[in-house]
Amino acid sequence: MSNIIKQLEQEQMKQDVPAFRPGDSVEVKVWVVEGSKKRLQAFERVVIAIRNRGLHSAFTVRKISNGEGVERVFQTHSPVIDSITVKRRGAVRKAKLYYLRERTGKAARIKERLNRVG
């Protein structure tokens, strides 16, 4: 029974999800329905948490909008998500960046992760 469920979940998982980690700045384009119109809406900022659960995986993105912190949880393999683009790699040492909720301005900055050559 569980093999059948795993196979069905594997078929529904998206294959084009880029590799990103907490601390990375990402742009998530989401389909939004307003009345009878359907359009793409971009949500861009820092990934503060990732929950890896196969088909049920999710990640949390936090941004500051008009001085207010806005967090949005996205299901990684949701059909509502059109694309995920990594804009900037962040160098952090924790898996969950919930401490950014209390920080604003320059205190909430994250160093950029540089890839080693060689």
From Swiss-Prot:
Stored InterPro entries: Ribosomal_bL19, Ribosomal_bL19_CS, Ribosomal_bL19_sf, Translation_prot_SH3-like_sf
GO MF annotations in UniProt: structural constituent of ribosome
GO biological process entries: translation
Keyword Transit peptide set for record: no
Cellular component annotations (GO), alphabetically ordered: cytosolic large ribosomal subunit
Domain of life: Bacteria
UniProt entry keywords in alphabetical sequence: Ribonucleoprotein, Ribosomal protein
Pfam families reported in the protein's UniProt record: Ribosomal_L19 (PF01245)
Family recorded in the similarity comment: Belongs to the bacterial ribosomal protein bL19 family.
Annotated function: This protein is located at the 30S-50S ribosomal subunit interface and may play a role in the structure and function of the aminoacyl-tRNA binding site.
Protein name as catalogued: Large ribosomal subunit protein bL19
Originating species: Serratia marcescens
